[in-house]
Amino acid sequence: MAEDGSEEIMFIWCEDCSQYHDSECPELGPVVMVKDSFVLSRARSSLPPNLEIRRLEDGAEGVFAITQLVKRTQFGPFESRRVAKWEKESAFPLKVFQKDGHPVCFDTSNEDDCNWMMLVRPAAEAEHQNLTAYQHGSDVYFTTSRDIPPGTELRVWYAAFYAKKMDKPMLKQAGSGVHAAGTPENSAPVESEPSQWACKVCSATFLELQLLNEHLLGHLEQAKSLPPGSQSEAAAPEKEQDTPRGEPPAVPESENVATKEQKKKPRRGRKPKVSKAEQPLVIVEDKEPTEQVAEIITEVPPDEPVSATPDERIMELVLGKLATTTTDTSSVPKFTHHQNNTITLKRSLILSSRHGIRRKLIKQLGEHKRVYQCNICSKIFQNSSNLSRHVRSHGDKLFKCEECAKLFSRKESLKQHVSYKHSRNEVDGEYRYRCGTCEKTFRIESALEFHNCRTDDKTFQCEMCFRFFSTNSNLSKHKKKHGDKKFACEVCSKMFYRKDVMLDHQRRHLEGVRRVKREDLEAGGENLVRYKKEPSGCPVCGKVFSCRSNMNKHLLTHGDKKYTCEICGRKFFRVDVLRDHIHVHFKDIALMDDHQREEFIGKIGISSEENDDNSDESADSEPHKYSCKRCQLTFGRGKEYLKHIMEVHKEKGYGCSICNRRFALKATYHAHMVIHRENLPDPNVQKYIHPCEICGRIFNSIGNLERHKLIHTGVKSHACEQCGKSFARKDMLKEHMRVHDNVREYLCAECGKGMKTKHALRHHMKLHKGIKEYECKECHRRFAQKVNMLKHCKRHTGIKDFMCELCGKTFSERNTMETHKLIHTVGKQWTCSVCDKKYVTEYMLQKHVQLTHDKVEAQSCQLCGTKVSTRASMSRHMRRKHPEVLAVRIDDLDHLPETTTIDASSIGIVQPELTLEQEDLAEGKHGKAAKRSHKRKQKPEEEAGAPVPEDATFSEYSEKETEFTGSVGDETNSAVQSIQQVVVTLGDPNVTTPSSSVGLTNITVTPITTAAATQFTNLQPVAVGHLTTPERQLQLDNSILTVTFDTVSGSAMLHNRQNDVQIHPQPEASNPQSVAHFINLTTLVNSITPLGSQLSDQHPLTWRAVPQTDVLPPSQPQAPPQQAAQPQVQAEQQQQQMYSY
């Protein structure tokens, strides 16, 4: 070991020679040393991102603001090692004063034990101080006392009450004529407003005049409570105490937040007074003229002095502090109607003054909304007594519940808690206080008053998730859900927001005795007595519930449904359930058209004209948030504020054009528009858009997004007891449970069809509106429901994942497989009473009866006029009598502009040897295909002499059947089947009547030559109807669009340009194929961009070349007279490339 004063020698142990060496091993050499990486201390690594540490010129370090810090920004709590006594006091010592009075010291000597707040330097002068340190509970916090601009160093000093406990002086104001205590140096008035205000009764100092006013009113209350003989003594300390210059006087105990006055039990029959810590931070400014105020206060002649009774003497001090013209405080200031100097009277005095002065001022100025806000938690109250009662909750909680160890600040709160929470052995007769609105019962009257059930709309809205609540207490409970889940159940590890809820949940896992104290639950241990709640059974139906409260709610369902929805007629047991139900109707307004919306609004008693001026505003997240910028009035609910600005200021607010709701705030309106998916590119709306990063769905609040994300976790903890289906959320399970009921309470206003769930009704309404949000990526077909789109997509893949283990049959859907299994298990139990056909499920039987046996209005075949009575008969007729006809209808061209030019004045059919027959198209029947006449095959000599009518709507001609050039086996002569029919109904742009229609005469008929291996069995014709709506005209040009049906490949092709692709023959097919062709012309027409342009390889649709052999030049048909002037189609134009989609 080295001697004292010498450097310590580091010895290194060598494993090889088993010796210590002071430098290096003589045989193996030096040791390679690896040092740790540099790690910031805890104090420096915990620095917030908007702060930074800078080194000053004198070498010291300070904390500086990077961004703007507004006033009343709180930092903390201060973290450090806590000791009973300091070894060495720091430059800014901190203590925490416990309930028993013993202080605990903060050891700030080590940066690794503290957070960044230890690096903030204390202020030396008052103008340098911008942070205030104070104790709250068992921690110390820093709060900004003014706005701090970027680049300013943070400097801290003690708050007034905390400085008194720490026995530290307040900082003095440098360069002003006011002492640190706020007492003027001389009697001359100070021009500038002092930064601190002093009480002339007890010399307490205050940073704000408002705090001094409320403090003086406390002295007034004390003077009023003293007997008459003692009042002279109460007014004695009116002299200004001589204080040494630069040394402030000791701050009295009255300046502490947790004052003795707050800890006193309030006297019976008297409202507790408001201490200075309870001062309102949001005060309504009074805009009444100052002359009127002077007139109110003038109760004495101008020259008559005022008697100096103690209460009036203190009120003299109050008014003297508020009068800018006052220079003598020995008497009440004299106000006259003709004073030239203006009088400034703070609204805080009007709101807080007592007795006659307060009554007189309120009587003259009129009642105004009063706002009282807690200094500590910023909670708002409507009156000072509630604020006084609330502030005590931030102080010491001396009353402990013996049952659950919960602490209370008032004994009354403890009694109410014990009576309400721990009276489980009382009989049901003790529930004698019943709510007249929802019929909920309570044991004590105060619990009924706290219940505060409302019958009007939910007006309290959460700022996080925008959810509405009927009472402020329910909103406060709900807000805790947005915090962290800190309490875990020891049995199942489930997390909770509140400890009391966790303990109640944990009791459900326990078995044994009936009563268990919460101390035993918190202590835990192996010897913990098990407890289980005694179940409660319904006396009507016998259903068992885990607790009596749930049973009481269920018991209401056996009573009469007294509350009826005026919109849909549905009845409810409780009015709060009815109120929630009415909100569902408003959610579906967006799916209605203008007529339906007007009818709906009229049904609920609001007209659209009145809606512009008298619409209600959804309530805000917290009462008293709305403040009118013009008259400074505040409102507790949004509809009150909206009514105010409409009636008083003649403003209309912000109205939603979709659902006709109106909002007073623009921010609320923008958040509402996210629901309708409107104005999403607007930056004002985008800040309310919260997209899901997994599926891309957007929400207008973080709370709704977080609830949605539960679906993506894959955890489905809520299972249906009837079918076993699981869900991620409890509300989804409740919605699903309606599926098992046979009650279809949700009726469609369009068709009257009943739905079991609101979700199903919303999707059903989309069908009536034609809203199809989901598109197949393969064929671009759109669907209204996602489940139908997913089922459709499986047809493209051909994957069948589900197999019946009994017979081996595979299915693409699980529900289809489950239905099939019923054949093996229960058999076909449902028999048709008409034809004795049997089915597995009742639904299949109902569909059979509906389609087969139910008589409907007689339907006529559009081709031959045959009338049938059922849909099944019509399908059977078309299948047997007209197998060659395929109808393709275009019913909706809403996406096209008003005037459209389609690059297709004709639709040509490329087929072997076709014959087109004339059809009589009835006038005024727009969109219906003409009846098909009988097929006629004329001989060539008859064709030549056949006259062509001049007024024919369609050209009629026949061509001689030609043989195929290649060998196609026995199918050569039968390849040409029935006549190809093309019926096109278009709006005539030359006719003014929109309902008129003309036949398209420019039909291209092209015989084709196929390869030897190509086989045809049944070439199906096309009937195209409703190509345009009666309100819209289409301008046509002379270009030709040809549609080809390939029966081998089963695809439809378009011809519009020369064939420039070499085609290879196809292999021979084994058997002829009969193909049913479907072509979506709506997709074709709407996808041409720009309209009128030629189709090309760069078309938005996916096109592929279809093999085709060289096309023979067509034989020209005999053209009718009206077609004589049209140009003939050249042979080279017939050799076109075919594209399939």
From Swiss-Prot:
The keyword DNA-binding applies. A zinc finger (C2H2-type) spans 197-219, 372-394, 399-422, 460-482, 487-509, 536-558, 563-585, 626-649, 654-676, 690-712, 718-740, 746-768, 774-796, 802-824, 830-853, 859-882. Residues 1121-1141 have a biased composition (Low complexity). It is found in: Nucleus. Coiled coil: none annotated. GO terms for molecular function: DNA-binding transcription activator activity, RNA polymerase II-specific; methyltransferase activity; promoter-specific chromatin binding; RNA polymerase II cis-regulatory region sequence-specific DNA binding; zinc ion binding. The keyword rRNA processing does not apply. Residues 262-274, 927-938 have a biased composition (Basic residues). Detected in all tissues examined. Pfam families: PRDM2_PR (PF21549), zf-C2H2 (PF00096), zf-C2H2_4 (PF13894), zf-C2H2_PRDM15 (PF23573). Keywords: Activator, Developmental protein, DNA-binding, Isopeptide bond, Metal-binding, Methyltransferase, Nucleus, Repeat, Repressor, S-adenosyl-L-methionine, Transcription, Transcription regulation, Transferase, Ubl conjugation, Zinc, Zinc-finger. Residues 49-159 form the SET domain. It comes from the Eukaryota. Residues 236-245 have a biased composition (Basic and acidic residues). InterPro entries: PRDM15_PR-SET, SET_dom, SET_dom_sf, Znf_C2H2_sf, Znf_C2H2_type. There is a cross-link at K517 (Glycyl lysine isopeptide (Lys-Gly) (interchain with G-Cter in SUMO2)). Residues 224-283, 604-623, 922-973, 1108-1141 are annotated as: Disordered. GO terms for biological process: methylation; negative regulation of MAPK cascade; positive regulation of canonical Wnt signaling pathway; positive regulation of transcription by RNA polymerase II; regulation of stem cell division; regulation of transcription by RNA polymerase II. Residues 609-620 have a biased composition (Acidic residues). PANTHER family: GROWTH FACTOR INDEPENDENT 1 TRANSCRIPTIONAL REPRESSOR, ZINC FINGER PROTEIN. Belongs to the class V-like SAM-binding methyltransferase superfamily. This is PR domain zinc finger protein 15.
